[in-house]
């Protein structure tokens, strides 16, 4: 399947080469495409769908636990109904009022459960938090998960802090309204509308920032989490307004589902909300990884031939086991190149029909390595040859074997690169001294 984001990035990179003096413009074009490519590669749309169904099952337990925590603070007594109104007014479109009524009824019934029933609800809520944890750690490429006790404390902190922040937001709103209503501070009359209008955005920004900073098992810089929170809050408000307008003005679901339209509408809204959350997470992670990825990709061009051989070797090894490798898996096998570096090698290899994607989106060899030579690889995309001395110094078996062939190429490029990739991958390295000759092509490189 063709990758439209990758194709766009290639075109933008070509344009960027002509804008050598305008680095900020190249970054402004390439960074959003970098985020979009990571979003696609991390299967965020599929993860958003999974999280939507998980949220639908855990929503009543979450509200029950949140209201219980909220009621435990005397300062918030009597504000339960106002908190629910605040929650639904600012987090869901106006067209899902029917869902609000049903959820309030469900929460009221859940409040009468026994201790065992409440524990079961808590498990449902924690399972949803665990699903969020997996999605976030996949975005940050975190392999090691938290210890169970540490993870439970993080989840419980999120469940506890959310009602408190909402209660504080509601308390500030009530204070501003009461002050202006009784005319104690006329100067606040203009400030009232500003505070009330901006408070949902501020609360959403704080919530998203906390989510991006606390949930990944990774030290996320606070400024990156804050920028991601601002972006997610802005996208969330835009999505809420746009989706609310669509449902109100284009009543497709009401015409099809009738009285049951609220359920698919609410489910779609949950899906859009999680898409926004994951976009913000990818943006937050990209703020830290983009500069490193650019640096690695810049160095990859000088080492592209070696990396191409190594990528083909990893695919050859995986194919002997009857499987392919994803881009992410190849990036983990070649961490020095990074994702952008590996992608810069995969694209020309695919154009040369040396590799292809299988039905599962994994890379596999498309040529028989016993008949595909180093010369074929060199001529396919004119990869620059690496230094033999550098390969000898720090290389592994594959690098040493490649160095043998390049050393032979000093006396004849065609004969030296006539060796097949299968020979490179199966033969043990034969250590030979580096032959230094005048005007040696590989040494000059």
From Swiss-Prot:
<feature type="transmembrane region" description="Helical">
    <location>
        <begin position="195"/>
        <end position="215"/>
    </location>
</feature>
<feature type="transmembrane region" description="Helical">
    <location>
        <begin position="56"/>
        <end position="76"/>
    </location>
</feature>
<feature type="transmembrane region" description="Helical">
    <location>
        <begin position="152"/>
        <end position="172"/>
    </location>
</feature>
<comment type="similarity">
    <text>Belongs to the UPF0761 family.</text>
</comment>
<keyword id="KW-1003">Cell membrane</keyword>
<keyword id="KW-0812">Transmembrane</keyword>
<dbReference type="GO" id="GO:0005886">
    <property type="term" value="C:plasma membrane"/>
</dbReference>
<feature type="transmembrane region" description="Helical">
    <location>
        <begin position="225"/>
        <end position="245"/>
    </location>
</feature>
<dbReference type="InterPro" id="IPR017039">
    <property type="entry name" value="Virul_fac_BrkB"/>
</dbReference>
<keyword id="KW-0472">Membrane</keyword>
<keyword id="KW-1133">Transmembrane helix</keyword>
<feature type="transmembrane region" description="Helical">
    <location>
        <begin position="259"/>
        <end position="279"/>
    </location>
</feature>
<dbReference type="Pfam" id="PF03631">
    <property type="entry name" value="Virul_fac_BrkB"/>
</dbReference>
<keyword id="KW-0997">Cell inner membrane</keyword>
<protein>
    <recommendedName>
        <fullName>UPF0761 membrane protein Mlg_0521</fullName>
    </recommendedName>
</protein>
<feature type="transmembrane region" description="Helical">
    <location>
        <begin position="112"/>
        <end position="132"/>
    </location>
</feature>
<dbReference type="InterPro" id="IPR023679">
    <property type="entry name" value="UPF0761_bac"/>
</dbReference>
């Amino acid at each position: 399947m063709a990758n439209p984001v990758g194709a766009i990035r290639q075109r933008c990179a070509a344009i960027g080469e002509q804008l050598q003096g305008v680095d900020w413009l190249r970054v402004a074009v390439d960074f959003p495409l970098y985020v979009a490519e990571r979003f696609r590669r991390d299967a965020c749309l599929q993860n958003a769908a999974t999280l939507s169904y998980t949220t639908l099952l855990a929503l009543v337990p979450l509200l029950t636990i949140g209201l219980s925590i909220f009621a435990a603070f005397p300062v918030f007594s009597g504000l339960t109904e106002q908190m629910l109104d605040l929650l639904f007014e600012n987090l869901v479109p106006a067209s899902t009022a029917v869902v609000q009524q049903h959820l309030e009824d469900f929460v009221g019934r859940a409040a009468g459960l026994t201790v065992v029933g409440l524990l079961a609800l808590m498990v449902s809520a924690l399972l949803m938090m665990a699903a969020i944890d997996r999605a976030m750690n996949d975005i940050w490429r975190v392999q090691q998960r938290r210890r169970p006790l540490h993870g439970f404390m993080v989840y419980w902190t999120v469940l506890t802090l959310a009602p408190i922040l909402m209660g504080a937001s509601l308390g500030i709103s009530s204070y501003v309204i009461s002050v202006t209503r009784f005319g104690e501070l006329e100067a606040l009359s203009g400030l009232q509308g500003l505070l009330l209008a901006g408070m949902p955005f501020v609360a959403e920004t704080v919530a998203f920032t906390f989510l991006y900073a606390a949930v990944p098992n990774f030290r996320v810089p606070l400024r990156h989490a804050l920028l991601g929170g601002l972006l997610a809050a802005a996208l969330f408000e835009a999505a809420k307004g746009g989706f609310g307008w669509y449902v109100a003005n284009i009543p497709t679901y009401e015409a099809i589902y009738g009285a049951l339209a609220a359920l698919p509408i609410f489910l779609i809204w949950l899906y859009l909300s999680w898409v926004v959350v994951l976009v913000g997470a990818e943006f937050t992670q990209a703020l830290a990884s983009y500069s490193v990825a650019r640096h690695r990709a810049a160095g990859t061009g000088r080492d592209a031939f070696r990396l191409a051989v190594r990528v083909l070797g990893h695919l050859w090894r995986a194919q002997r086991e009857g499987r392919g490798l994803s881009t992410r898996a190849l990036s983990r096998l070649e961490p020095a190149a990074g994702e952008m570096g590996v992608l810069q090698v995969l694209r020309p290899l695919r154009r040369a029909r040396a590799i292809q994607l299988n039905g599962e989106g994994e890379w596999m060899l498309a040529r028989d390595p016993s008949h595909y030579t180093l010369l074929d690889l060199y001529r396919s995309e004119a990869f620059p040859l690496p230094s033999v001395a550098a390969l000898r110094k720090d290389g592994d078996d594959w690098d040493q074997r490649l160095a043998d062939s390049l050393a032979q190429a000093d006396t004849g490029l065609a004969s030296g690169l006539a060796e097949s990739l299968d020979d490179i991958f199966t033969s043990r390295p034969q250590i030979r001294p580096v032959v230094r000759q005048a005007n040696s092509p590989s040494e000059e490189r």
